[in-house]
Amino acid sequence: MRVMAVGVFDLLHAGHLHYLEQSKALGNHLTVVVAHDDTVRVRKHEPVTNHDLRKRMVEGLKPVDEAIVGNSPDVSIFEILPVVNPDIIALGYDQEHAEDSIRQKLNELGYGEIKVTRVEGLSDDLDGTRKIIARVLELSRNKD
């Protein structure tokens, strides 16, 4: 079973690793789509590291079989499906994507056989990049 996971993966942390470990457990091949820099800028924030470096970091993680950079924001994420050819799309616990709307779009595009599942989060206060940055800033302020 081929699994596809998608994310920004800016400043890798334990939450990312947990997401990818759980995603890999769903099948035997994990392809990770690392968000294109322009997509990150449009949907979230200015990335700290560029997509090529984030891809390289993700490729080095044990659960990952393959990592690719995703489409620019003017191209639908669904257009990457023929490249990845997943049986399962694994969503992170904190990703805003609605499973039902993804399933509906998959059906419309003729990919109704692809399963969509959401993996569990890591039970840690510092499981997200923004949380880690906030904690570092807090520690820095308290140091003074």
Q: What is each stretch, according to the model?
A:
Residues 1-144:
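Nucleotidyltransferase catalytic core that binds NTPs
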